[in-house]
Amino acid sequence: MRNTVLKAVAIAVALSPAIGLAQSKATSATYITDEEVKAVNATPGVDRTIRVVDIGPENYAVGVIHRGASNAAGRGAGTGAGAGAGAGAGAGAARGAGGGAAAGAGGGAGRGGAQQGEPCGEQSTAPTTGGTPGMIAHDQQTEGYLIISGGGTLVTGGKIVNGRKSPPESEVTKVLNGPSCSGTAVGGDVVKKVVKTGDIIIIPAGVPHGWTDIGDHVDYLSFRPSARVLEAGYVNPALKK
């Protein structure tokens, strides 16, 4: 557990180098316990924000994500990545999305329901071949991942073609990642890398990302600093009981 805490601190420093230099009015620390992470991760769904904190120059969110095995039934009623990623409906839909079916499809899986947003990414009338479906890119939200259990293949890079924006009132936009674009990613700079417990990944805002080839499962913490993209003060309902 000590190593996990140290890695989490390292991610925070890497993602927010300006914290120590900015004129911040934040004067207290926020503690998220191992028990709280487990309590949130035990709830149905895939991607769940734990807390969003005002740290002065920006807001800082921490989430926990569970993805089940690729092409296997998981928690909830699995919708598949293309539907979940490209949509981003309300909280109930997101929490009901299946971890397993969503896992094999990509980063946007489980982050929404069936509502379609506006077009985004590169628009093309030509058929998209050889791309990775179910990818998502966040307009202003950088993410740092710390894999805490399991593993799989993380896909990053490229550009999204014929994507869909997350609707303004969706959970993706308001609670998880801010405005985002989901769809199939293509390009010679797409990277597919197997990641495992203990690995750290930093994904800058605007970089498409998603998952494939998850064996049993992958669980990870997501550290999300941003310039007021998410509303400070949010606390996951599982911690209010």
PLM-predicted stretches and their roles:
Residues M1-V9:
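Bacterial N-terminal signal peptides that target proteins for export
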Residues A8-G20:
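Bacterial N-terminal signal peptides
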Residues G20-A137, G233-K241:
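A short, N-terminal "cap"/entry segment at the start of jelly-roll beta-barrel domains
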Residues G134-A137, E143-L146, K192-K193, I200-I201:
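His/acidic/aromatic-lined binding-pocket segments of jelly-roll/cupin-type domains
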Residues H138-G158, E169-S182:
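Short, conserved beta-strand element in jelly-roll/cupin
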Residues G163-V195:
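Double-stranded beta-helix
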Residues V194-I214:
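Conserved metal-binding segment of the jelly-roll/cupin
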Residues D216-Y234:
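A short hydrophobic beta-strand segment most commonly corresponding to one strand
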